[in-house]
Every structure is written in structure tokens, then in C-alpha cells.
Amino acid sequence: MEFFRIQRDIPFMRFAPVLNVISALLFVAAVFFLFTRGLHLSIEFTGGTVMEVHYPHAADLAAVREVPRRLGYGDVQVQAFGNPRDVVIRLPLHAGESSTMQSGRVMAALQAADPQAKLARTEFVGPQVGSELATDGLKALAFVIGGIMLYLALRFEWKFSVAAIVANLHDVIIVLGFFAFFQWEFSLPVLAAVLAVLGYSVNESVVIFDRVRENFRKYRKYTTVQVIDSAITNTISRTIITHGATLAMAFSMFLFGGPALHYFALALIIGISMSIYSSVFVAAAIAMWLRVKREDLLKSGPGRPKNPNDPNAGAVV
């Protein structure tokens, strides 16, 4: 499906040298902030107190969120749970206070603001459990990256595989770098968004590389740069449709999803935008710098008749 077709190929690779330098600087900056500032982990990773409060009416989340903040709990997560009358409050660990003391103080303040509020459940998430979640999250990220690397190694010639893997890491590190620089809260939903970004990034690179391989067979007189420019130009319409729809969904969650989905949607917006950029100016550019050529993708087909009038005779992918 295409919204439009561009008749003349756009010279994307003409801008690759400058944009590759910018990408390298962004990547180095992201790594620097990850090591110096680190990620601002949520209580799911660091531990804390989880309270479930029931109201006989729809709860005012903004008012509920303000109550623990007035008590000195800065990084509080408040969200509706199941229905508008049930609220989940996540409190970070506080020096000198037990989980029971935390929940007691907050509940007393909530009932002072609304006597009908009732504590339905309280739970303590210890630092050890949070550490296990962080470890499991890193394992999930490593498994996804490993699976993508294996798929690319089997699916493409090694130069394309290296280019796609570098583009994947570029996107993930820069997303994490944004969260480290601005100290946005990194939670389990944000980790899920990072894993989704990995999928979007490799998908876009694979689409372009498939078209590059097809164009090598189709245009024998084209140079490598011309083949790559043509492949990217031919896939622009598809990119606009798929990523435009996904970004529209992510922006909807960002604008209307409330605090619970805020950083999840933000990670998706940054990651998907970076995947569009990196598939063109990182993955395709690296394939160009590695000097991918027709001979890397096409090989002689044994026993096949060769037609001298067929420019692709004897070549198979």
C-alpha cells in the first residue's frame, strides 16, 4: 500500500557523513550520562511500599497524588487500579521509616482529606525483590538483543547484520541516555517500551535491506550508493504509514494516558523516531561504509542456463 510514489530517488547517502558524526556524538553523550547520572529507577526496581486504597466514588488522582507529596514522598506513583474507585499508591523507601509507618502516615493523611477512603491492601517490595526485577529486566533485554543478532546473522550477509545490530544498539542507548540525562523515571513499562523499540528498529532496517537486495538484482548498472538511495526512497510510503500510525498511538497515550503511561509513551515516541532515523542514516550508511556490493548478495546458480540478454542471468539471492 502506498500513499504516493516518488519518481526520482532521493540522495539520502549524501547526508550520511554529517549525520553519522551527529549520531556518534549522541551515542557517546548517552553512554556518558548513563555512567555518570545513571537511570532514575522506580520502586519496582529499588523497593518500596505499595498501597491499594478504595473510595466509594471516583477518586481524584491529582488530589490523592498531592497528599503523600506533602508528607515528603517525592517520587510517588498514583494510578487507578481496575476501576476509578480503586487507587494504587507506590511509595519509595524512606530513611528511618518502616513500610507500616509509611502506609500509616499516608493513610491518615488520605482519610483526613476524605474520611471515606479505606485501605484495601498494603505490600512491601524489598530491595532484594527490586534487584531481582532489575536483573530479570536486563536478562530480557540481553535475550532480545541476542535473538535479533541471531536472526540477522541467518537472514542477511554479515555486513548487513553488523549494520542492523549497530543501529539497534544506537536506538536503545540513546533512549536510555534521554532517561538518564533528564532523570525521568525508569519503570517496568518503560523497559517494555525499550524492548518494543528494538523490534521496531530491526523491522525497519530489514525492510530497507530487503529492498537493497532486490535492487541489486534489478539495477545492475547502479552503484552501491544509488541502490541504497533507491531502496530507501521506495520504502518511504510504507514507513510513513506504519510508523505514522504507531506514533499517533504513542502520542495519544502521552497526551491522554495520564501519569501511568506518560514515560512509557515517551520512550516509544523517542525510540520509534530514532528507529526511523537510524534505519536510514545509521544502518544503511554503515552498510555503505562497509562497501556492501552485489557480489556479497548474489552468487552463481549452478546448472542454470545463462541468457546473455538477461542482465540477471545466473544470479540468485
Where are these regions (language model features)?
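A structural signal for conserved, well-ordered secondary-structure elements
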Residues: M1-V317
